[in-house]
Regions:
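Acidic, surface-exposed loops and disordered segments
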Residues: 1-92
Length: 92
C-alpha cells in the first residue's frame, strides 16, 4: 500500500510510473510522424534549475525530446536491425 511506503520508496515508485507515460507519448508521437528521443543520465540539478522545478515537490525522472528529423539525415533510411523475438523472449 502506498501510504505505508517511505518517501524513498514513493519516489522510486513514481519514477517507474513515469515510464508508462513516456511509452504513451512515444507511441502517440509516432502516430503523428513526430520523432522522439527518450533520455536518462542527464544532470537533473541543472535541468531542474533551468526549468524552475520546485525541488521540494517535483523531480525530473526522464526526458523526452520531440521533433522532426532533418530531411538530409543520412541514417533515416538505413535498414533497422532487429533480433528475432525467440532470441530474447521466453514465454512461460
Amino acid at each position: 500500500q502506498l501510504e505505508n511506503q517511505t518517501s524513498q520508496e514513493m519516489e522510486s515508485w513514481s519514477e517507474k510510473q513515469s515510464y508508462i507515460v513516456l511509452g504513451s507519448l512515444i507511441m502517440a508521437s509516432a502516430q503523428e510522424n513526430i520523432d522522439t528521443c527518450p533520455m536518462e543520465g542527464f544532470k537533473s540539478d541543472i535541468l531542474e534549475d533551468v526549468l524552475k522545478i520546485d525541488k521540494e515537490s517535483e523531480k525530473i525522472a526522464v526526458v523526452l525530446t520531440l521533433g522532426y528529423r532533418a530531411e538530409d539525415d543520412n541514417f533515416q533510411n538505413f535498414k533497422k536491425v532487429r533480433k528475432p523475438a525467440d532470441k530474447f523472449i521466453k514465454f512461460l
